[in-house]
Design a protein with these regions (language model features):
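Acidic, low-complexity terminal tails and accessory targeting/binding regions
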Residues: 1-7, 53, 97-109, 153, ...
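Active-site-proximal alpha-helix that buttresses catalytic centers in soluble enzyme cores
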Residues: 2, 7-8, 12-83, 133
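Beta-strand elements within well-structured catalytic alpha/beta cores of enzymes
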Residues: 8-12, 153-159
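Phosphate-handling substructures
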Residues: 18-22, 26, 31-38, 79-140, ...
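Glycine-rich phosphate-binding loop signature in dinucleotide/nucleotide-binding domains
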Residues: 56-58, 146-153
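Short glycine-rich phosphate-binding loop at a beta-alpha junction
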Residues: 59-66, 89, 154-158
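Alpha-helical structural signal in soluble globular domains
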Residues: 76-80, 166, 170-174
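GST superfamily/GST-like fold recognition
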Residues: 161-165
């Protein structure tokens, strides 16, 4: 069931990093990689294009993950849309999903932990990690706080792939099965992409 919203939301995934290229086939999330994962030149360009699209949206508030690749994204966006960086709210709950002991593993090996059944990831977490449901719960908690604090505002949320995919699913009232179908059909949010809700 879709929630009734008081605000307009713009979900933006950070720009492309080395981990979104064909060269990498590993699971990552947070804690941030060592050395930290930074935007590629292509990622910076994606974000600039997103910023140009956001210019006309009159963004009132920006909420973002505190991970470096998102901070870099926010800095570029803020400059383009004329938003004061001092006003950005960085929130740890908007971080990427925590893959725990699977972080840094090959994607195929990581999915083997779930018997190659993506539906299991909604309920099942790994040691030192979290499930998709847990990730969605923390994203929705931030959304609820925003909804309780503001009305008729244009809100930009800058985060990561899985968290934004899960938040968008909640906002659109999608079932877990619908979310998996979306992922399998490569319809989840791409780097530098804006989804308007």
């Amino acid at each position: 069931m879709k929630p009734i919203l008081k605000n307009q939301y713009f979900l933006l995934r950070h720009g492309k990093t080395i981990h979104q290229t064909e060269k990498k086939n590993i699971i990552y999330g947070y804690p941030d990689n060592n050395p930290p994962c930074v935007l590629l030149k292509e990622g910076i360009e994606e974000v600039r294009l997103a910023g140009e699209k956001l210019k006309e949206k009159n963004i009132d508030y920006v909420f973002a993950s505190d991970i470096l690749r998102v901070k870099q994204t926010v800095e570029i966006i803020a400059e383009i849309i004329g938003y004061d960086l001092e006003k950005v709210v960085y929130d740890k709950r908007l971080r990427d999903i925590n893959w725990g002991i699977l972080g840094g593993k090959n994607k195929e090996d990581a999915w083997a932990y779930y018997d190659n059944d993506k539906m299991k990831k909604f309920e099942m977490s790994v040691p030192k990690g979290e499930s998709w449901n847990q990730c969605q719960e923390r994203m929705v908690a931030v959304l609820n706080e925003i909804e309780n604090s503001y009305q008729n505002k244009n809100i930009l949320i800058v985060s990561h792939g899985d968290p934004l995919w899960l938040l968008e699913g909640y906002l659109k009232g999608k079932s877990n099965r619908e979310l998996i179908d979306e992922m399998n059909n490569n319809q989840d949010i791409k780097t530098g992409e804006i989804r308007e809700i």
